[in-house]
Amino acid sequence: MELEFFKPPLYQQRYQFVKSYVDTYKPKKVADLGCSTCSLLHTLRFWDCIKVLVGLDIDEDVLSRKKFTLTPLPAHYLEPRNTSLTINLYQGSVTQKDPALLGFDLITCIELIEHLEAEELENFREVLFGFMAPITVIISTPNAEFNILFPKCTGFRHPDHKFEWNRREFQSWATEVAKCFNYTVEITGVGEPPRDSKNVGFCSQIAVFTRNYTESEESLQRKMECKSVYKTVLHIVYPSLQEEKYLRRAVQKVALFHAYQIKANFLQQFIHREEEEEPHNTDTEHRPCMDLKLTSRWPTLPQTEQDESMEPFLQEDTLYVPLKKIFSVPKVKELCGNMDNLRTMITGEATLSNDGNAILYHIDLENSC
């Protein structure tokens, strides 16, 4: 149930709150409890900082229907992520302990707690803050004081809600949880009320819990001995440049593209120079075409000091494109790290000189001169 004046829609504002947190703090392991249709997970998979993304929900049918929205697209294979990403979907209850959700940087519970019975809520806080104990927890829940602005709302906003708290009740619960489990909590929200109803507060109230301690390895190891109870609905590893086959493919794509650019530019300048010299040379059929150096200016390559060893050159009918020239491309350097890696990754896809320091291209001098 949402009012028309929420722009963007309230659910998007809740997701944006989480995304802003991710932008700021760069968590590597993120889980969404009560993930339902996986909409938040679908959005977060595009953040390079996240390496592990987990969704947990009690409804296996919904997870099975929506899991395909989290599988890699063709674009993910064409342009792999810089960092690894593993996505897991589990069917299970938020009141159950399972080692699969240990060691997380951020766990979100968006509009979840109001669906829990009182006993479940008590177990939930023990499982989340005592067992899972992530560095940060973001919990959102409806603000009951806002309901007077919903004309058709005579009870709770959703038939499955077991309760809806006002601001005082939510703050009291959050403060008690923070004190009990050694967290700091800040209360905020999304969904601004109309100007004439500011006194009701946000439509969705949000608590951000931050852990005040560092969990020991011994504590984690003890928890890891807990029996697994969640059912895996999806396990997928996204293609990334951390895998050699994807890194090699990316290096070849970038490096050989620039090598081909250098070759094309060389021939263009070569032909242009020949055409300029033609009126002044009566013996055009026997002009030497050897040892021509390229002095080009590349918009896509960095402008560095002149270095003879980096310049392409012709030797008989072979064009030599030094690997130093290719390695000077920022993206190539970023991907490879050093010249040896560049040489290794293009071997087999390009013809290299005997010393392995240049890419070779056969040039048809008869048609070029």
UniProtKB/Swiss-Prot annotation:
It comes from the Eukaryota. This is Small RNA 2'-O-methyltransferase. Transmembrane segments: none annotated. Its EC number is 2.1.1.386. It catalyses: small RNA 3'-end nucleotide + S-adenosyl-L-methionine = small RNA 3'-end 2'-O-methylnucleotide + S-adenosyl-L-homocysteine + H(+). S-adenosyl-L-methionine binds at residues 39, 57, 93. Its cofactor is Mg(2+). Methyltransferase that adds a 2'-O-methyl group at the 3'-end of piRNAs, a class of 24 to 30 nucleotide RNAs that are generated by a Dicer-independent mechanism and are primarily derived from transposons and other repeated sequence elements. This probably protects the 3'-end of piRNAs from uridylation activity and subsequent degradation. Stabilization of piRNAs is essential for gametogenesis. It is found in: Cytoplasm. The keyword Transferase applies. GO terms for molecular function: metal ion binding; O-methyltransferase activity; RNA binding; RNA methyltransferase activity; small RNA 2'-O-methyltransferase activity. It comes from Xenopus tropicalis (Western clawed frog). Its main location: cytoplasm. Binds 1 Mg(2+) ion per subunit. SUPFAM superfamilies: S-adenosyl-L-methionine-dependent methyltransferases. GO terms for cellular component: P granule. GO terms for biological process: piRNA processing; RNA methylation. Mg(2+) binds at residues 111, 114-115, 161. Belongs to the methyltransferase superfamily. HEN1 family. It is an enzyme of class 2 (transferase). Coiled coil: none annotated. Keywords: Cytoplasm, Magnesium, Metal-binding, Methyltransferase, RNA-binding, RNA-mediated gene silencing, S-adenosyl-L-methionine, Transferase.
